[in-house]
Amino acid sequence: MSDPVAFAAMRSLLAARPSRSPRSGGGIATGAVGIDAALGGGLPRGRVTELISAAAGSGGELVFASLLASTRQARLRVALVDAADGFAPKSFRPDLLRHLLWVRARSLPEAMACADVLVRDGNYAVLVLDVRGIPARVLNRQPNSVWHRLRLAAEQHSAAVLVQSSAAVVRSAPWRLILREPAALAALRRTRDERAAALTAELARGHPRNIDILTA
């Protein structure tokens, strides 16, 4: 899907599609080797993983592009809640967007409400909540209870939730990875896939372990 949907339209879309009981356990490969290795194989189902892009160009978009390709191959749906209007679909191949639901939120509270609805729906293997671009003062005003609610919903519905941020905001996240270094100029001459494969992340929270990767 190359066009975003608003909150109300998202509710109508989900209402027309029966909810599913997602598969429990296991993980979902992002396709970015360094990220998957740090997580013990991929994004764990039933958990919130926070991916911090500490500097511009440090690789957050590469991880998302790789995730879209990996889930497309595995025939898994992805939902993106875009809290700061940062998603640029024209930079992605059209075939990578066919399994993506893109929700453009008008505010952080609306973004959190969208994420809460989607994580409980069961039709999406991965929920990505992108809060990069939201000012730190706004994020810091977000009650801890809202993040805790998202974490509980992920656990109850076996959803893999990826929060993309610029600094640590999800205090209750079981997993936190940090992309610290922007890409060197020489790396920009490589393909997107090559740059994604070369990414490395610091594991700031969590305990890597081998998990079963789910496919179609």
Task: State where each predicted segment sits.
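Detector for small/aliphatic-rich hydrophobic stretches
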Residues: 1-80, 94-97, 216
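Solvent-exposed alpha-helical segments within well-ordered globular domains of core cellular machineries
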Residues: 33, 37, 112-117, 148, ...
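Conserved RecA-like P-loop NTPase ATPase core
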Residues: 35, 51, 100, 127, ...
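Hydrophobic/aromatic beta-strand patches that form the interior of the parallel beta-sheet core
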Residues: 49, 79-81, 101-103, 162, ...
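Conserved inter-motif catalytic segment of the P-loop NTP-binding fold
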Residues: 66, 74-137
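Short, solvent-exposed loop/turn segments at secondary-structure junctions
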Residues: 134-139, 170-172
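Charged helix-capping and loop-helix junction motifs
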Residues: 141-149
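Phosphate-binding/switch region of NTP-binding enzymes
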Residues: 151, 155-216
